[in-house]
């Protein structure tokens, strides 16, 4: 697998409202652990849309790993121009910091937000252009990642497209391992 799309919950879906929330350490650690396994198997790129939450945290985790894995690249392909336009300032700063370090950055539709169709097009593009999907998602705690997951499941039915999860149980294990 060369290209891995990553998505997951937005911060509010996880009850995270501050960028210094202790939970972020464990979320990023769980993401890093999964990325390292993929890197050892030949992963070259992670693909995110720059969405707040898991996607930006995954990019930050990837940037941390680039010291040890300098060939790992991050692509940020937004569904439309200025997706951060109405975000709060700390969120904009985090987003801009992620974009500044990205190896590739583009906007899929080359227009500002017009309709939910742009998100659907983004999901399809990500699944079409990647070799697998990693989600921080628990099907028992439904949230925004369900749309990308649905697109991935349709492709999996056609060609076996791999879908990987980081679940709430995985996060608990990460916390427990760190406690020893």
From Swiss-Prot:
Which Pfam families does the entry link to?
Answer: YpsA
Alphabetical list of InterPro entries matching this protein: YspA (IPR010697)
Family to which the UniProt record says this protein belongs: Belongs to the UPF0398 family.
Instruction: List the PANTHER family hit by this protein, alphabetically.
Output: UPF0398 PROTEIN SPR0331, UPF0398 PROTEIN YPSA
Query: Can you name this protein?
Result: UPF0398 protein YpsA
Q: What is the lineage of its organism?
A: Bacteria, Bacillati, Bacillota, Bacilli, Bacillales
Q: Which gene encodes it?
A: ypsA
